[in-house]
């Protein structure tokens, strides 16, 4: 199987894991432990290492711009902490957007846990970063969103989270301990931070299987969205402002590692589109089979922070036998996704249309098609 071999990953976290509980041979401590040894950090590292046991995990202090230059093998990372709980797109969100845009590293962020029943449910910072993949929590025994999993979109109005997955993990054979803050680690962890560590581990495994996705966060996000095929029972009733079909299902590895076709376009702002469109054909289509297609693109955080909107608005259209079979044309999202069944065996004509363009930022556009 695929185990993250050859892949480096980062965790941004002020606490440190207890070394007797984790695999220290695949763990590199690059920062001082500002919060000492913590239950939370131990749990995050355990989940990641269980999911991608051969990946090397580099720990950085909490922050949105880890200095990864000295470790070029780092391809993926995760942030399982939160800063702000309101609707504002903050400097931390901007900094993470810039980090992903400049370094081409796929970064996962926790959607956040709503601890108060009267709270606002806004996705927490830095999970509002548009280039990041924000992860909601699903209870594995019901396949429903956790009641505490945050879902409300920021002032930018882009849909968050983009994915949601299992958030409850148990390591019954781990030795219990009391951490440096007086909290007891008992091998059990639950929350969106756990789902985030798990997602980063899954992506490390994908990079092991398909190196093509390395250094392409725009394709990685499209892949995670199209691979979210296992339906979440209460997705529509839980996430009230997500009208797209992202984060309505759980990513399954079999639908990330197999049965997909991917491509990307990269260059200066004026590249890649003929007029306002990119048009191509998908062949070997099978009638009545299910297809999911997503596009995703990266943007500079500074523009989003200044203008509170996306610098490029790109839409997705799928045509078969001269008829538009599916389309997704949101105005605020940095991704589009469609889910449909083929009407015939005819080729699909894919049209990616840049509906609006500020002229700011490069074209960094990823595409993925999944088929059952």
Name these PLM-found stretches.
Residues 1-32, 163:
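Acidic-leg catalytic submotif of subtilisin-like serine proteases
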Residues 5-9, 52-57, 72-77, 102-107, ...:
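Loop/turn elements at helix/coil->beta-strand transitions in domains of secreted/extracellular proteins
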Residues 13-15, 122-207:
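Extracellular S/T/G-rich loop segment that most often corresponds to the catalytic His/Ser-adjacent loop
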Residues 14, 28-95, 136, 216:
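Subtilisin-like peptidase catalytic core
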Residues 163, 208-290, 306, 326-335:
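C-terminal subdomain of the subtilisin-like protease fold in secreted/lumenal serine endopeptidases
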Residues 219-223, 278, 308-309, 317-320, ...:
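C-terminal edge strands of extracellular/lumenal beta-sandwich accessory domains
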Residues 291-307:
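Short amphipathic, basic-aromatic surface patches that mediate peripheral association
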Residues 334-342:
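Beta-sandwich interaction modules
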């Amino acid at each position: 199987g695929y185990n993250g071999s050859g892949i480096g990953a980062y965790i941004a976290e002020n606490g440190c894991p207890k070394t007797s509980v984790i695999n220290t041979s695949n763990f590199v401590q690059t920062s001082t432990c500002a919060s000492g040894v913590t239950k939370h950090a131990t749990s995050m590292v355990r989940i990641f290492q269980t999911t991608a046991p051969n990946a090397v995990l580099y720990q950085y202090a909490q922050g949105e711009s880890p200095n990864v230059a000295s470790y070029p093998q780092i391809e993926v990372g995760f942030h399982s902490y939160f800063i702000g709980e309101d609707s504002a797109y903050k400097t931390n969100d901007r900094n993470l957007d810039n980090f992903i845009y400049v370094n081409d590293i796929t970064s996962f962020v926790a959607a956040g846990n709503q601890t108060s029943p009267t709270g606002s449910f806004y996705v927490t910072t830095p999970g509002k970063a548009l280039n990041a993949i924000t992860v909601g929590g699903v209870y594995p025994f019901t396949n429903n969103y956790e009641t505490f999993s945050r879902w409300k979109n920021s002032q930018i109005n882009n849909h968050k989270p983009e994915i949601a997955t299992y958030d409850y993990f148990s390591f019954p054979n781990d030795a219990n301990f009391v951490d440096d803050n007086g909290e007891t680690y008992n091998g059990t962890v639950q929350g969106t931070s756990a789902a985030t560590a798990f997602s980063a581990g899954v992506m490390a495994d994908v990079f092991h299987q398909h190196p093509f996705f390395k250094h392409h966060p725009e394709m990685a996000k499209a892949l995670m969205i199209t691979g979210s095929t296992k339906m979440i029972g209460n997705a529509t009733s839980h996430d009230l402002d997500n009208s797209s079909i992202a984060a309505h299902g759980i990513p399954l590895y079999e639908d990330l590692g197999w049965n997909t076709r991917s491509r990307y376009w990269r260059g200066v702002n004026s590249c890649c589109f003929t007029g306002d469109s990119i048009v191509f054909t998908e062949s070997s289509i099978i009638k009545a089979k299910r297809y999911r297609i997503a596009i995703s693109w990266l943007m500079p955080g500074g523009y989003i922070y200044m203008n509170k909107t996306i610098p490029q608005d790109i839409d997705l259209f799928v045509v078969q036998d001269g008829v538009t079979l599916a389309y997704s044309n949101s105005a605020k999202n940095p991704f589009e996704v469609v889910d449909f069944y083929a009407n015939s065996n005819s080729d699909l004509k894919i049209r990616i249309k840049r509906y609006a363009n500020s002229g700011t930022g490069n074209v960094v556009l990823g595409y993925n098609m999944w088929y059952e």
